[in-house]
A protein has these predicted regions:
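Zn2+-dependent peptidoglycan hydrolase active-site motif and core
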Residues: 82-83, 97-137, 162-168
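Short hydrophobic beta/alpha edge segments that flank linear recognition/processing sites
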Residues: 87, 116-120, 145-157
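Acidic, glycine-rich catalytic/binding loops that coordinate metals and/or anionic ligands
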Residues: 88, 139-148, 167-182
Length: 182
């Protein structure tokens, strides 16, 4: 048998209140972590670096792609870096484009854990990723407007429940979506 502490390479901690516990889970260190992933041919999403520090000027305004409960934040999670935020919502809830842009990926399948996902390019190196979708409503090459429905919430890929995994990237570097929309 393996314990949860061993599985996630962590140690036991005791907290006196909820706020201290939550704060310890989401401590952010301003640094850039570069992860290189060996190609297995299973993921269409290229490896990216992660900016856990300052907000970057995107040159565009973003809206929330989904109203719901923030279930997982950007940053360190289970010994790895979570490159986006997870927003819980009911299966089939519409997901909208956070900004106008061109669809560069609209893919069904496991996709390296993202499941069915959409990637939009907004120009100037800015991209958004929408993962774990049930259905994809747009195709590669289409131009979408800000607020246009592009997919529906699901639990595809490496997922434990219905939610949207939402990422913002600038020149391949993952940014904290909470700096912009949540």
């Amino acid at each position: 048998k393996i314990t949860i502490l061993e599985k996630y390479n962590t140690s036991e901690a005791t907290f006196t209140d909820v706020e201290t516990c939550v704060a310890s889970l989401y401590k952010e260190k301003p640094k850039v972590v570069v992860k290189r992933v060996a190609s297995t041919g299973r993921s269409a999403i290229p490896p990216s670096s992660v900016n856990t520090g300052a907000k970057v000027n995107l040159g565009i305004s973003l809206i929330r792609p989904l109203s719901g409960t923030l279930t997982s934040r950007f940053g360190s999670r289970w010994g790895k870096t979570h490159k986006g935020v997870d927003i819980g919502a009911s299966k089939g809830t519409k997901i909208v484009a956070a900004a106008a842009g061109r669809v560069t990926v609209s893919q069904y399948g496991y996709s390296g854990g993202y499941g069915n996902y959409i990637m939009l390019s907004h120009g100037n190196g800015v991209q958004t990723v929408y993962g774990h979708c049930t259905s994809l409503l747009v195709n590669v090459g289409e131009y979408v407007s800000q607020g246009q429905a592009i997919a529906t919430v699901g639990s595809t890929g490496r997922s434990t429940g219905n939610h949207l995994h939402f990422e913002i990237r600038v020149n391949g570097i993952a940014q904290n979506p909470q700096n912009y929309v949540y």
